[in-house]
Amino acid sequence: MNCEREQLRGNQEAAAAPDTMAQPYASAQFAPPQNGIPAEYTAPHPHPAPEYTGQTTVPEHTLNLYPPAQSHSEQSAADTSAHTVSGTATTDDSAPTDGQPQTQPSENTENKSQPKRLHVSNIPFRFRDPDLRQMFGGFGFVTFENSADADRAREKLHGTVVEGRKIEVNNATARVMTNKKTVNPYTNGWKLNPVVGAVYSPEFYAGTVLLCQANQEGSSMYSAPSSLVYTSAMPGFPYPAATAAAAYRGAHLRGRGRTVYNTFRAAAPPPPIPAYGGVVYQDGFYGADIYGGYAAYRYAQPTPATAAAYSDRNQFVFVAADEISCNTSAVTDEFMLPTPTTTHLLQPPPTALVP
């Protein structure tokens, strides 16, 4: 009888030790389903009844309690290795909770296993890699191997205050560079220059503009030769037809129309040059005159035939792009504009048209 009591007492003490080991793990919730134990043994499992004999109590606790503890440690070790970031050790911030072993298999998808990068803004300027590692704790660096860890770090650290600065943790996205095309408010390819307030046309070409000064023979006003021709390569309008040329020749000077009469065509128009374009100023001072940017300047001495053709009066005539035009009517100051190009002339004329 004494031996039987000692054996029974020893079996009861041996059965109490595994119960104390199983209490921190709270294995009553998930250990029985893993080992296939029926549901009726789940409730009396932590507290065995005293009427059980030694032969039945000891094998039950020996076979049922220790294997769940070992499988639980293996599973927690696997979870810990899954959450470990390369180059850093995990801390209690990233340790799995009691409910994670049940939900972890559902979260381990292909998207969750891909690396994920977080963008942390508004952090102190003195922060370096050790500071970031200390701030993120067990999450390691900002670049995570597991997308679930990155999401958990973002939810935990977003909006926190570090040294008086509220940091923001968001998902880093790839920056896409796009070439935005400017909207042209004008039709037919005309473009507006906001600096000078002018409208440029893409259909202008670099033609030749002749500013002819024809002096009367024996005039005492000028001591220069009988005729000077000021030539400059300048963008002008292409004149494909007479109707279009007539429309452009009726350009306004200070709101007034000026008709240019043709005498003869000098040569065929040169090919278009897209780099240079004519310009129509919309400013009130210039009116709606048609101007052109200069590409080069040069002086040329005209032939005697050209000098004789322009020797009837003292005036400057604006010649269109592909033709030499002279105004046979009297040119007065009413139709003239101050020209900024008078410094390029050999001799200042009494009046001048602005090209």
Swiss-Prot record:
One of its GO terms (molecular function) is mRNA binding. The modification Asymmetric dimethylarginine is found at residue 298. Keywords: Cytoplasm, Methylation, mRNA processing, mRNA splicing, Nucleus, RNA-binding. GO terms for cellular component: cytoplasm; nucleus. The record marks 117, 125-126, 141, 165, 175 as: Interaction with RNA. RNA-binding protein that regulates alternative splicing events by binding to 5'-UGCAUGU-3' elements. Prevents binding of U2AF2 to the 3'-splice site. Regulates alternative splicing of tissue-specific exons and of differentially spliced exons during erythropoiesis. GO terms for biological process: mRNA processing; nervous system development; regulation of alternative mRNA splicing, via spliceosome; RNA splicing. This is RNA binding protein fox-1 homolog 1. SUPFAM superfamilies: RNA-binding domain, RBD (SSF54928). Its main location: nucleus. Binds to the C-terminus of ATXN2.
